[in-house]
């Protein structure tokens, strides 16, 4: 766009062809209002100011900047992995509308059921090595899957009855292995194989007994953390008791991830201290 404006300010016959090509490209990609689109997207996704240093951004802010850049590039196929992570309710509402109006194809992985309901037109379920498509949103998928599971249960019951009959025939018939009976035996083998394929695998998670916790679990005293002039946490003091379950809430960029990173030792506070009890073993997913 800047190059086109430059050519128009210094228009000549020599630059006419280049100007025409640029105009066609700008028209096809709807770039005339690009700057306004960028501002609107950054505001909707609550991105930090455009001149902010990336090194000073929180994890949530970096993710929103990356999402903003991806959406504005408008690829033919948009692949999104948990797009609602680090987004608040208003931002998710904007993203839902943006994706419903998106000119290309969108494929996403998400555990946000409400987001799936409001955006998707197809659901692809991966089940025991198969991909099963369903037309409709998540609610429609649940209804269709329930019907499919009922049908599969009827088919499984019918298959088991057929297997039982064939087992009785094989055991009782002295002529079961004659040439004319081999086709029936093959059919029996096929039924058994189909039943094995339908049988879900067993999964087991073993959680060992934890050591006894001491009096100190996690304690913070006068914890302070800043990035440049931006203060995220100031003089924070708390004690987490044994067995306590705490939800950390706050707007994007408030310092939630930074607090966790200080607890796990991935970042150090500017002042104050975090103490993790000697008997405490931390487990986390970043």
UniProtKB/Swiss-Prot annotation:
Domain of life: Bacteria
Role of this protein: The induction of virG by growth under acidic conditions and by phosphate starvation, in the absence of plant inducers, is influenced by ChvD.
PROSITE patterns given in the database record: ABC_TRANSPORTER_1
Key word Transport present: yes
Keyword Acetylation: no
Family: Belongs to the ABC transporter superfamily.
InterPro entries per the UniProt record, alphabetical: ABC_tran_Xtn, ABC_transporter-like_ATP-bd, EttA, P-loop_NTPase
Organism of provenance: Rhizobium radiobacter
Annotated ranges, domain ABC transporter: 21-85
Keyword terms of this UniProt record: ATP-binding, Crown gall tumor, Nucleotide-binding, Transport
SUPFAM superfamilies given in the database record: P-loop containing nucleoside triphosphate hydrolases (SSF52540)
The name this protein goes by in its record: ATP-binding protein ChvD
Record GO terms (molecular function): ATP binding; ATP hydrolysis activity
GO BP annotations listed: negative regulation of translational elongation
Pfam family, one: ABC_tran
Signal peptide per UniProt: none
């Amino acid at each position: 766009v800047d190059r086109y404006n430059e050519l128009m300010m210094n228009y000549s016959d020599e630059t006419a062809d280049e100007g025409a090509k640029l105009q066609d490209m700008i028209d096809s990609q709807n770039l005339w209002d690009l700057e306004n689109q960028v501002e609107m997207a950054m505001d909707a996704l609550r991105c930090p100011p455009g001149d902010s240093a990336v090194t000073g951004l929180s994890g949530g802010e970096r993710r929103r900047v990356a999402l903003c850049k991806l959406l504005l590039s408008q690829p033919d196929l948009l692949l999104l992995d948990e797009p609602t992570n680090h987004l608040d309710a208003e931002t998710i509402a904007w993203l839902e509308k943006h994706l419903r109006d998106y000119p290309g194809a969108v494929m996403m992985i998400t555990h946000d059921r409400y987001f799936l309901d409001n955006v998707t037109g197809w659901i692809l379920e991966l089940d025991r090595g198969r991909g099963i498509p369903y037309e409709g949103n998540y609610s429609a998928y649940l209804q269709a899957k329930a019907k499919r599971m009922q049908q599969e249960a009827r088919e499984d019951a019918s298959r088991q009855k057929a297997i039982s009959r064939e087992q009785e025939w094989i055991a009782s018939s002295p002529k079961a292995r004659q040439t004319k009976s081999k086709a029936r035996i093959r059919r029996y083998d096929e039924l058994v194989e189909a039943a094995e394929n339908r049988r879900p695998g067993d999964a087991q998670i073993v959680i060992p007994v934890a050591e006894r916790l001491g009096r100190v679990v996690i304690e913070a005293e006068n914890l302070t953390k800043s990035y440049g002039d931006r203060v995220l946490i100031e003089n924070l003091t708390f004690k987490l008791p044994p067995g306590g379950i705490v939800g950390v809430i706050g707007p994007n960029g408030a310092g939630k991830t930074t607090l966790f990173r200080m607890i796990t030792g991935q970042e150090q506070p500017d002042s104050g201290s975090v103490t993790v009890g000697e008997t405490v073993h931390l487990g986390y997913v970043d």
